[in-house]
Design a protein with these regions (language model features):
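Single conserved hydrophobic/aromatic residue that forms the stacking wall/gate
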Residues: 112, 118-121
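Short alpha-helical segments enriched in small residues
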Residues: 1-113
Length: 121
């Protein structure tokens, strides 16, 4: 689904969205907010690039990062769960991954995206 189509659906269905980003560095929030009338649905965009930002801003338990890594399903899930506590949006999205050029033990572009919602968009 394109960002333009999602934009139209969010407005039509009067849904709100917030995002917590890491590897994308705010690009997801930018893609939503560059469209006219995005204020009707876009509530919050947090860029938590460092582990410290994930811990301090999104309250990700440091043991999750230590055990599973910042680029893991567990970390991404904690990011979105804690985002939902502060944003109150109907839809919350988190993304974490390896942006490159080097990825350490994980491949460049290895990414986790979490979008829990009770209703289809």
């Amino acid at each position: 689904m394109s960002i333009q189509l999602l934009h139209k659906k969010l407005i039509k269905r009067k849904l709100t969205i917030s995002v917590a980003e890491s590897c994308t560095g705010g690009l997801l929030a930018h893609n939503f907010t560059k469209l006219a009338n995005s204020s009707k649905y876009f509530q919050m965009g947090l860029t938590t690039y460092s582990n410290q930002a994930k811990i301090k801003i999104l309250k990700v338990n440091k043991n999750i990062i230590k055990k599973f890594g910042a680029v893991s399903h567990e970390c991404c899930k904690a990011m979105v769960q804690n985002l939902s506590k502060i944003s109150k949006s109907k839809i919350n999205v988190s993304i974490t991954g390896i942006a490159g050029p080097g990825g350490g033990s994980k491949a460049v572009s290895y990414t986790h995206l979490t979008l829990p919602t009770k209703q289809p968009v």
